[in-house]
């Protein structure tokens, strides 16, 4: 889908979690992070359910924070838009987009202040992606002009964007309006129990 939603990485993390569960391995075992790191830089992130701060190449867990409350969100992507993650990082390395130091958002996450944390959301790689694919910027501008959005930004390297919303109804209405614009859109929510095993009933 080339959306920046971490599809392959979440699939890999899901397999690791499922195998750990099946083999009776504690999910807190650092060996699982090492295995995940060998697959891809962002796979370790998806092994953990709570917000976290990673260092190094983005694959070394430094700090985990308390889970945030369930929050309505809408995902929006121009149907034909795509961004090469490799190219986005290459351009970022050539001309890095500045970003605020993480101290303020880390403090908000540590105290569980979702409102402040969401207000500080920033994706400096998304700046590059929007330059590469102008339709991303069109979606961002549209989302930011809508009532009820709490935070708007690019998902990963794009081409999907998200808007955290003040209510589930807002997310649903925005998804419907985005679809009327010809974009792919989906209303959902951020949840705190993202890493879990759901075995089929026998």
Which residues does each predicted region cover?
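Short pre-catalytic strand/loop immediately N-terminal to key active-site residues, enriched for Gly-Thr
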Residues: 1-4, 149-152
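Conserved, helical-rich catalytic subdomain that frames metal- and/or nucleotide-binding sites
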Residues: 48-151, 166-169, 176, 187-202
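Short hydrophobic/aromatic beta-strand micro-patches
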Residues: 162-164
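DPxDG-like acidic metal-binding loop motif
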Residues: 3-31, 45
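Phosphate-handling active-site elements
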Residues: 18-39, 167-178
